[in-house]
C-alpha cells in the first residue's frame, strides 16, 4: 500500500469537467471556508470546524506533507483550474481490498451541474485501475 500512496503525491486525473489532483498548501483557504460552513458540514454528516485558520493551516500542512497510508485526499478543480471541492478515499483496508469514498463540492456555483458525477466516475476509474482496491463504499 505504501507504494500506492507515494504514487498519489503527483496525482492528476482529467475528467470531462474536472481535474483531480494532489492536495497543495494553496488549497487551505478555500478548504477552511468550506469546513467552517454549517450547511456543508451538515451535508457531510459532521460538525463545522471550530479551529482558527492558523490552527487549521497546521493540520492542512501535515496532511499535505505527511499523507496517511490509509487515506488519499484529492483536490477537485474545474478544467480551467478553479478549486471547487475535495474528495478522498479512506479507511483503506488492504486485507479486504476495500475503502470508503467521500466527496464535497464546496463551491455552490458548481452544484447540480454534473461536476460531482464527473468526479465520482474519474475517481472510481482511478481507484479500480491503479490500486488493489476491489470494493468502494459510501
Please place each PLM-identified region on the residue numbering.
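Conserved GNAT acetyl-CoA-binding A-motif
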Residues: 129-138
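Residue-level detector of family-conserved "landmark" positions at structurally sensitive sites
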Residues: 45, 120, 137-138
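Conserved acetyl-CoA-binding loop-helix of GNAT-fold acetyltransferases
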Residues: 112-126
